[in-house]
């Protein structure tokens, strides 16, 4: 609706903008717990079945958040929310772009952000992990993204890795 001179308009608040949104009881006959699960490869499952609809899977990745009171993983679209299980990391680094001045990560929610090299660490099975979303979440590198790091990844001694970005070296913890 186009603004009309002399009239004021109030934007309607989405439920998710209410300060107590995450404290509201679930709809009658339902629970905030769900059978939705995110596996270590970044694939969503519901009731044991793979979520394979591309638009739904994209939305689920975009809805990942932390409950503000208990810190558990939730999915929220601003109108409702539910808890879900995360097998490993809530985000996956799908691809990366290596530039002379740094590396940018493309995450499973299709967002792009600069790599924070000081937050890199090696986990089980030699998987690489990094902090994302302002350090609030962890992302696991896909095999493709981890391989793309090879040109700037160096092994000084067996098992001791460092990353060279923008002329600086970062040890990987």
Mark where each language-model region is.
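Terminal leader/tail segments of proteins
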Residues: 3-173
């Amino acid at each position: 609706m186009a603004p009309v001179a002399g009239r004021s308009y109030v934007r309607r608040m989405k439920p998710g903008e209410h300060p107590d949104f995450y404290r509201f009881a679930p709809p009658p006959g339902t629970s905030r717990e769900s059978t939705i699960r995110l596996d270590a490869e970044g694939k969503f499952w519901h009731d044991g079945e793979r979520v394979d609809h591309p638009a739904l899977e994209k939305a689920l990745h975009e809805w990942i958040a932390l409950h503000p009171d208990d810190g558990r993983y939730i999915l929220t679209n601003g109108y409702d929310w539910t808890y879900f299980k995360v097998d490993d990391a809530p985000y996956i680094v799908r691809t990366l772009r290596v530039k002379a001045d740094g590396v940018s990560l493309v995450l499973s929610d299709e967002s792009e952000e600069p790599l924070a090299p000081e937050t890199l660490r090696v986990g089980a099975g030699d998987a690489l992990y990094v902090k994302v979303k302002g350090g609030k979440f962890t992302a696991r590198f896909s095999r493709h993204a981890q391989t793309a790091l090879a040109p700037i990844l160096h092994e000084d001694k067996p098992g001791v890795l460092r990353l060279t970005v923008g002329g600086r070296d970062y040890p990987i913890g």
